[in-house]
Amino acid sequence: MSKPYFIPPIDEEPRMPGSEAELDPPPQWEPRYKGSERLKDKVAIVTGGDSGIGRAVAALFAREGADIAIVYLGGEEDADAAETKAFVENEGRKAITIAGDLGDVDFAKSVVAQTIDAFGKLDVLVSVAGEQHPDTDLGDITPEQLLRTFQSNIHSMFYLTQAALPHLKEGAAIINTTSITAYAGEKELLDYSSTKGAIVAFTRSLSAQLAPKKIRVNGVAPGPIWTPLNPFGGSTPEKLATFGADTPMGRPGQPNEVAPSYLFLACGDSSYMSGQVLHPNGGMIVNG
């Protein structure tokens, strides 16, 4: 390969994240309360902003006064991205959609360049996009799948953050998405869980590096959340049948129950927090 970037064959794995419009019941992603301008006139990049948690974050940030660059894979997800963009604009804010694969370093650079061209600045970087492929046996994880999962979940985070840093100033916030699997493990998601552990370490280490610049870096570790990721190939049918039932609350979470964690970490309410991870996971205790 001329560069460390792997494009999987079309028929190798289900395409992710899939269309949110096809989910039954539909996820709850719209903000549940009025905004209070906690992100007034800020500019945010939100990856995975077409659907799921990313869509809920983009919608809530817009309600709180931010303009949004919605980054997503493209293709089947175009309609979802357009709906997210329309919501942002209906909130009186500006939005652009940028489609492509963040595992490609050149695309990651392009995302930041397009955001700066459109809005002139960048205040908040939110990385949500990722993928997972269930395997019950370690031996079933191919080298291609391993590379692809790390490329989508953690390499992309390095690339996008590297591109964004020259534009982030004092008071900026970086928010990374890890997972409960980084703390509790998941026997059918060995490669995915490994990337999420790497994200925790990346978040803590980058926080230490950027603290002198007064740029905060935190993370969110969701539990089972009802998004397209699991129904569109990210979970086995057996797991999907009882998705979220093993949490103390006995149900999966909704995207708009997770988005406020990102808002808290993006705004001044969390001005004395960096290197931390919030755990919207239905009451599971992970001591992380």
How does the language model describe each region?
Residues 179:
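Residue(s) in the substrate-gating loop at a strand-loop-helix junction
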Residues 3, 7-8, 34, 104, ...:
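Conserved mid-core segment of classical short-chain dehydrogenase/reductases
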Residues 161, 195, 203:
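Active-site helix of classical SDR
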Residues 23, 30-31, 135, 184, ...:
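Short C-terminal tail/terminal secondary-structure segment
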Residues 166-167, 208-212, 271:
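Alpha-helical segment proximal to the catalytic Tyr-Lys
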Residues 188, 212, 224-247, 287-288:
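A glycine/serine/threonine-rich, flexible loop-to-helix segment
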Residues 37-70:
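Canonical Rossmann dinucleotide-binding motif of NAD(H)/NADP(H)-dependent dehydrogenases/reductases
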Residues 123, 139-158, 175, 199, ...:
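Catalytic Tyr-X3-Lys loop
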